Amino acid sequence: MGRKSAILAVILAIIYFRSNFSKMSNTPVQETEGPVYVAYSMEDMLKSPRDLYKSVKEVAKFVNSAEGKSMSARFKKFGTPREAMDFLAYGDAPTTPKTVPPVAPTEPNSPFSGVNRIQMNEFKKYVEKGDMENFLRLVDSNPRFLVNTGGDVASIVMEGFRYNALHIAAKAGQTEIIAKILELIQNIDFLIRLYGTGADDVTLRKINILDSYLNTPDKGNSDTPLHFASKFGKIGVVRVLTENSATDRTLLNKSGKSALDCAGERYTGEDKDMVQRDIHLAIEGFYVFLHRNPTTGSTQLTVSQKPPATYSTSPTTATVTVSAQAGPFFTEREARDFAKSWQTAGKELKRTDFDKGWERVGRVLAEQSEAMWRETWHFLGSMELLDLGSEQGLGVLEAFLREKRRGNLRNSEISEISTKKSIFRRGIHARKLDFGILDGEKSAEISENLTPDGSDSADDEDDDDIFYDTFSEIPAAAEKSINDPDDTLGSLTDRFAAISIFSPLPPPPPPQWSNSPNFDYSEGEDSFATPPTTPPPTFVADDEPCKIDNDLFEVLAQISSELISKFPLTQDYVQKLGKLTAHDRSTWRPIDSPARCDSRRKI
């Protein structure tokens, strides 16, 4: 009987261990059996049961049991039995390394506050009317009128249709406002001021801002600024927009139309056919570009419907730049014929005129072909292509000459003041006072440390702190002072009265109008007279003419007097240079000519 009981116990033990062994086996469990639940101990994973449960009810029953509560059991759901068994074997330790996502760079905080709706309505009014002065005033006070720094996109001016400033200006035909907006949002200094970061940061943002302005459709009919300009027949705006390589000319609105398809739809003028022709030419026309390497002087002509995607905007950092552009032409064949003529014509002129030979030849060919012509002028400080035969191009030149004139006047005034202040430019042998006379040391010593030309052999940097004895201006007094020094109090008082800072100038003669009965003596020494002055001559490079002046004059001389009269400084420049003969102007050397540089050094 005992033997039977032992055999029975062994059989039961084998059955029990086989059952538990199947649960602990590493044999893969069918994935179709999930999801499953497991109960585990929060305190010790080794004490966790290795049972898998099919439902929440089953696992919750164990967790709430006395055994589960004793081990502080919790349950967890898994998608497959394999995941559950891995958890029981390894706990929460990851089986594969997790990749840490890169930390996004912190967005800079603009030093400018946001623009409210009332301010934006005022801005919208100036854009619509083309009020450049007030437009620039607002943008200068807060660049966020133009840029939404939150997403590096164009600021929304009208919330309903989500118009940016280009939408509004294009619809109103404000070409100058559009050109100024595009100039500002591509200006690195403007963006650095807006974001408060560096050039590398804003260069990347500039791309997104420019694309947002040019190619963002409105919320109504999905029209871009180019759609608006084309639809309302604003040919000037169309040209400005298509000149930018970032403009996508193929975008379609909700009606499935491109900007070219919309040409003149809302235009009601009698010259509608001509306007549509010009719009077609601006959007679909072909251009001939002159590429120039300023270092080697090599040139290349290319034909394209769009300007080069990227080129340097600074003449100092340029590699290969676009120096000139002719067109647009209706067909690619016309453009290539023009390029062929440009390549073969005027070989002698191109060879002898390194700076503007190609441009001079192309300018003549463009006039003969009645094609638009634009070229760069490096002295303006940028690589922008300009048509000096247009009001926009002449406006840029006028602004440059105005600033140049101001600089010349300022330098002239500074030079005049410096000359008046400096005793050493008057040929006067003044004597530096030795203040030892106040201490009874060397009572009458006046050091004469002057060089033969009247300059002090000591440090000239401290001229502002040197006092001079102006008795030298009165020969009798000076001779008496040296031969018969007098240290009395009265003599010292007279000496101090004669002390002068800077140059020992004699008293100026009374003004001519001082005897007038209407002269106001109450102003005394605070009264100043401004004599009439002749502005110093203005040339584009410096205070002497150079070859650039002759090149510029040749272009300006072909412009109608009626147009150029709108720009007084430019008109004055042309009139003055026109008084010289062509032979005289042709002798002006290039600005970087060694002979010219050497002559300027001698001066």
UniProtKB/Swiss-Prot annotation:
The chain crosses the membrane at residues 2-22. InterPro entries: ANKLE2_3rd, Ankyrin_rpt, Ankyrin_rpt-contain_sf. The keyword NAD does not apply. Residues 446-465, 505-538 are annotated as: Disordered. It is found in: Nucleus membrane. PROSITE patterns: ANK_REP_REGION, ANK_REPEAT. It comes from the Eukaryota. This is Ankyrin repeat and LEM domain-containing protein 2 homolog. The gene is lem-4.
